[in-house]
């Protein structure tokens, strides 16, 4: 039994090796067939909107046998979007069509004819062409694409360095260096941009922020220490209407000096207080009441002295 099992394993390994060798030998021909298929398919851009698949086939049939034609339509309106595809039976026919029609007038418009690549690659529709991944209209390097194009990550409204991008250096981007960006150095940014978190206009180091700026509660700010409504400014602890050093404070009018222990209406050295008019040592006080008219010179101790004399 063990011998049979071992023999079966050896036979299985041998069969797998033979199959792998056959697949490796046939792979170049398979890849070549795929390459030929892709090189025989063309992308046509800038087409007249009046062209349909029949008119497209008619225009390209003179350069070789056409297998398939396709005009890309808008999903909502059903109208042509201005580009399409033509597939030939051979790459030679496709090459002839490119040489004859690329940059030429077709039904009143100058068309762009090139090899059609996959959507993920570059150079054709979906790659370097309209709406593709890199360098084309809506691609990663084209208009509205991911990098460097109109609306791309490095282009107008793109993600990095573009006008309105969301990375750095773009107008309205949210990273660094962009006008209105959320990172550092941009107008309205978080770090050193105006209106951001630090050092900018309205930020923590800018106007109306939390530190060293106007309108905030930290130091050296308007409304902070030493400014209006701050702890050392108007209405603060040492200013007008505050508790120390200002009007209506503890040492000001209405505070401790005036109307307090050393002012009018106070306890010790003021009018109507002790030691002043109406106080303990003044008219009507308890200490001088014995020398008034009731117990004055007539009928007092002086009369007794006269009688004794």
UniProtKB/Swiss-Prot annotation:
InterPro entries: Nucleotide-bd_a/b_plait_sf, RBD_domain_sf, RRM2_NsCP33-like, RRM_dom, SLIRP/GR-RBP-like. Residues 258-273 have a biased composition (Polar residues). Gene3D superfamilies: 3.30.70.330. Pfam families: RRM_1 (PF00076). It is found in: Mitochondrion. GO terms for biological process: cytidine to uridine editing; mitochondrial mRNA modification; mRNA processing; response to cold. Residues 40-118 form the RRM domain. Induction: Up-regulated by cold stress. GO terms for molecular function: ATP binding; copper ion binding; mRNA binding; RNA binding; single-stranded DNA binding. Keywords: Mitochondrion, mRNA processing, RNA-binding, Transit peptide. It comes from the Eukaryota. GO terms for cellular component: mitochondrion. Residues 1-37 form a transit peptide. Residues 247-309 are annotated as: Disordered. Disruption phenotype: No visible phenotype under normal growth conditions, but mutant plants exhibit severe editing defects in mitochondrial transcripts. Homodimer. Interacts with ORRM2 and MORF8/RIP1. Interacts with RBG5/ORRM4. Binds to RBG2/ORRM5. Possibly has a role in RNA transcription or processing during stress. Involved in C-to-U editing of mitochondrial RNA. Functions as a minor mitochondrial editing factor. Controls 6 percent of the mitochondrial editing sites. PANTHER family: HETEROGENEOUS NUCLEAR RIBONUCLEOPROTEIN 87F-RELATED. Belongs to the GR-RBP family. This is Glycine-rich RNA-binding protein 3, mitochondrial. It comes from Arabidopsis thaliana (Mouse-ear cress). The lineage of its organism: Eukaryota, Viridiplantae, Streptophyta, Embryophyta, Tracheophyta.
């Amino acid at each position: 039994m063990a011998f049979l099992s071992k023999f079966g394993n050896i036979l299985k390994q041998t069969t797998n090796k033979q199959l792998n060798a056959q697949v490796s030998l046939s792979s170049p021909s398979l890849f070549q067939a795929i390459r030929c298929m892709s090189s025989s398919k063309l992308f046509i851009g800038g087409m007249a909107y009046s062209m349909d698949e029949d008119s497209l086939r008619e225009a390209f049939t003179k350069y070789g046998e056409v297998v398939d034609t396709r005009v890309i339509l808008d999903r909502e309106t059903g109208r042509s979007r201005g580009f399409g595809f033509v597939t030939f039976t051979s790459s030679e026919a496709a090459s002839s069509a490119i040489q004859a029609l690329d940059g030429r007038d077709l039904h009143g418009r100058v068309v762009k004819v090139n090899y059609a690549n996959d959507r993920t690659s570059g150079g054709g529709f979906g790659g370097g062409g309209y709406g593709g991944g890199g360098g084309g209209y809506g691609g990663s390097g084209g208009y509205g694409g991911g990098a460097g194009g109109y609306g791309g990550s490095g282009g107008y409204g793109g993600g990095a360095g573009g006008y309105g991008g969301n990375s750095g250096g773009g107008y309205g981007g949210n990273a660094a260096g962009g006008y209105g960006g959320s990172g550092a150095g941009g107008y309205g940014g978080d770090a050193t941009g105006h209106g951001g978190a630090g050092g900018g206009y309205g930020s923590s180091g800018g106007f109306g922020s939390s530190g060293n700026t106007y309108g905030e509660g930290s130091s050296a700010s308007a409304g902070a220490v030493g400014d209006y409504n701050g702890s050392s400014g108007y209405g603060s602890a040492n200013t007008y209407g505050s508790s120390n050093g200002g009007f209506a404070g503890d040492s000001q009018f209405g505070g401790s000096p005036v109307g307090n222990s050393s002012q009018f209406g106070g306890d010790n050295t003021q009018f109507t207080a002790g030691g002043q008019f109406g106080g303990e040592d003044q008219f009507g006080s308890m200490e001088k009441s014995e020398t008034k008219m009731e117990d004055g010179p007539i009928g007092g101790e002086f009369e007794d002295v006269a009688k004794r004399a």
